Amino acid sequence: MFCKNAIEKMKLNDREAIIELTPLWKGERFPDGRPKVPQKYLDEMRNMTLEELWKPIYLKGYESQFEGDLKTLHDDGRKLIGRAVTATYVPTRPDLLDVMFDVGKSEGRKGNFNQWVIDTLVEGDVVVVDMYDKIFKGTFLGGNLTTAIKTRTKTGGGVVWGGIRDVEQMKQVPDVQVYYRGIDPTPIREFVMKDFNGITRIGKATVLPGDIVYGAGGGVLFIPSHLVQEVVEGAAKTHVKDDFGFEMIALGRFTTAQIDRATWTEEMLDMLTNWIQTDPRGEKYRDLDWSQEYDLARNGDPNDTQTML
């Protein structure tokens, strides 16, 4: 029905397109082209809070990276952390349905559009799906596919701007967390894949393939891959400043107004770095570089009383 050459030109999960979408990432990549953020940063994030990780990217102008209007499969406090595999879907129409199934067939893909994505997952992945908020007949995940996610990703899961089903079965799958919009018993129907590992959207957040997904509580943060190292180090600074600040307030050394300032004075930084070097609680922060903070303390606006975010 459709021109063979046209079908061959259309690609899903296209390595070169993914590389072009993520030019700021300079490190290793997966075979599909997604940025391969080192596992050590994902591991460090498990001990960090949402606000600690959100702050560094927000200050850089990435203000559309969080969505909180979601439900969680498990409410036991488990976090969802991994590398995004993105997919975008639209309501079905017969001609587009035929085209996209022909594209999938030409690439050797089996099953339905949601299965195509699950079949590509590797360890540490999180599937991030825009189902255009479709819940009735929009149940992207159920018991079988959640089991497949566990098998392929080990500790991954999903973020679905749409529905799920078989919740009782899904909850029996260990080490998986899923964020979703609603539950419905209907199987998935009447949808078409628009894009696979391209730009997608989860509510108010924009997501690229390879972004780091950080789900905590009822919300999800999508961290650009090229900022992860800086974000983790910035979050560590926020964490140790909080630990030090709480103690200084309790001891009456500084006021809350002083601790909450965006820019600390040299005296405060001297006390902080000394505390890091001498207190056992500061041991894991001893490799952090505070030169930028000292530069702001010396050359910033002394009248700037803006509080930290």
Residue map of PLM features:
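Structural motif
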Residues: 34, 218-220
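Feature captures the catalytic cores and cofactor-binding loops of soluble hydro-lyases/lyases
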Residues: 43-209, 222-271, 276-309
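Short, solvent-exposed loop/turn segments at the edges of secondary structure
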Residues: 195, 215-216
